[in-house]
Amino acid sequence: MTKHYDYIAIGGGSGGIASINRAAMYGQKCALIEAKELGGTCVNVGCVPKKVMGHAAQIREAIHMYGPDYGFDTTINKFNWETLIASRTAYIDRIHTSYENVLGKNNVDVIKGFARFVDAKTLEVNGETITADHILIATGGRPSHPDIPGVEYGIDSDGFFALPALPERVAVVGAGYIAVELAGVINGLGAKTHLFVRKHAPLRSFDPMISETLVEVMNAEGPQLHTNAIPKAVVKNADGSLTLELEDGRSETVDCLIWAIGREPANDNINLEAAGVKTNEKGYIVVDKYQNTNIEGIYAVGDNTGAVELTPVAVAAGRRLSERLFNNKPDEHLDYSNIPTVVFSHPPIGTVGLTEPQAREQYGDDQVKVYKSSFTAMYTAVTTHRQPCRMKLVCVGSEEKIVGIHGIGFGMDEMLQGFAVALKMGATKKDFDNTVAIHPTAAEEFVTMR
């Protein structure tokens, strides 16, 4: 007999779990379908393990770059990769257990398997059919790969988290935040690291101050940056090393090559055609502001929609969807404007709102006023490895409403959240001026700019 649910989520990542738990809290009979581990990309091969590895890199940098000038004897140079991976795995296992406990508490049926649509109300999982009044597609995304000879010799971000040891020489190909973060982690852990970007700099969509400062730090501390670098082929050598060949004739030989050129939707194996769900030319599911697809009763959230591909965005959209469907809030939806973003690079980056070029294009040069601050991060100021910290406020109109906040430097990843609230609420430069600074911190620069 076919089992029927009020609500089914396909995909046990951040968006699916958040939405299904919220629906179950309102008394809905719910099921979550996931073929792999709970938590999706973020918990298993994304945000969480990446942050753990980033912390390890920061510890090494603290010891070797900054320790001597703080008076510490840093001659001991031992690092055990297996210990780090075991600690990371144990932490992720605890997150899995937490998810299982919450889903169990909410009486959500967790079905392990791959789901395929039979029709708009019916799914097939493990050879059995189940039906639902409402179905959420939250299948996420996966890494993209270039179409060049030898592409199979490289790994992607998923493969990085499966490495049995830290390679001595690594090439990371890509110019987005994933490439920048991975290259920073690997470089920080002590490997000879190369970052290959197609144009003049990484993170070109960020405010120019951000990308320019990042390049400055990379040139001083690594990874080695290769600009205008378009991959042509990868050759596997007799000794097992890999040679990345570029279109302009340059090449680099490494022990490990990581593709980090972007991500694509994971929508192609769930038989969307049987349900009639529309996708765009890139394979992303087309949704409106309420996360509705073109088929009544079928919804989508997260990376498979091509919206802002961040874990908190999928979580927020999923919860709001359940509020709308099951808690009598017919207009509930996520506002996708002014979403804060952090890049856990070395140093970290924080940004929310419009870049300076975007503001000038939208409002005109005469309506835009920019405030900046540039200084040496105090953490590094007493050492020979001094690192810049740069901040910017983008303001518009006579009232100087703040429409953009950007920063790069120590602590930026942790300080941005509160400032994002202020921007979302419509804060002005005067509001910032009227706020007493906390000293000595980097954050105080945002409220003391002149």
Predicted regions and their residues:
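A Rossmann-like FAD-binding core segment of flavoenzymes
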Residues: D109-K112, R116-E124, I130, L189-K289, ...
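Glycine-rich flavin
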Residues: T2-Y5, G12, N21-Q28, I33-L166, ...
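Residues forming the flavin
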Residues: T2-K3, I8-G12, A18, Y26, ...
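Flexible, glycine-rich terminal cap/loop adjacent to redox cofactors
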Residues: I8-K36, T41, V48, V52-A62, ...
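Glycine-rich dinucleotide-binding loop and its adjacent helix/turn
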Residues: C47, T139-K192, F196, Q224-L225, ...
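Hydrophobic/aromatic ligand-binding patch that stacks against planar heteroaromatic rings
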Residues: A18, R22-A23, C42, I135, ...
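FAD-site-proximal beta/loop scaffold in flavoenzymes
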Residues: E152-E168, S251-N328
